Amino acid sequence: MGIKGNDSRIDNIEFAVSDIARSKDFYGTVFDWRFTDYGPSYCEFTYGRLTGGFTLGEVQPNGGPLVILYADNLEQIQKRLEQAGAKIVIPIFAFPGGRRFHFTDPDGYQLAVWSNN
């Protein structure tokens, strides 16, 4: 699991989800992630440097760290998210060094997307 590298770096992000197929469809459609299934209750996702997994379990969308993804074009990725059924919970806003917005996925996890463009 993950890519071997330096000690002490974050290597993997895992989401407990209620439906692995739905999560694969959502993230694959919007972000073009690729998947490797490891049995019926675990699926690894990868895209570039990012590695993580979906595991069947109790969904806990609140109280964890905020996962922030990057996109060159925020408006384009926001449109793709909305078409895939995501809810935009914080619209695009500017901050020193870039812009970002927050959305919730099908299991209710809140994630953000940022850009320096």
Where in the sequence are the language-model features?
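Vicinal oxygen chelate
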Residues: 68-107
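Short secondary-structure junctions
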Residues: 31-37, 87-92
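Conserved active-site tyrosine of GNAT-family acetyltransferases
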Residues: 23-27, 81, 108
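N-terminal beta-strand motif that seeds the catalytic metal site of vicinal oxygen chelate
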Residues: 1-24, 65-67, 117
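Conserved short beta-strand elements that form part of the metal-binding/catalytic scaffold
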Residues: 33-65, 111-115
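Residues embedded in well-ordered beta-strands within globular domains across many folds
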Residues: 11-14, 93, 112
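Short loop segments at secondary-structure junctions
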Residues: 19, 48-49, 58-59, 71-74, ...
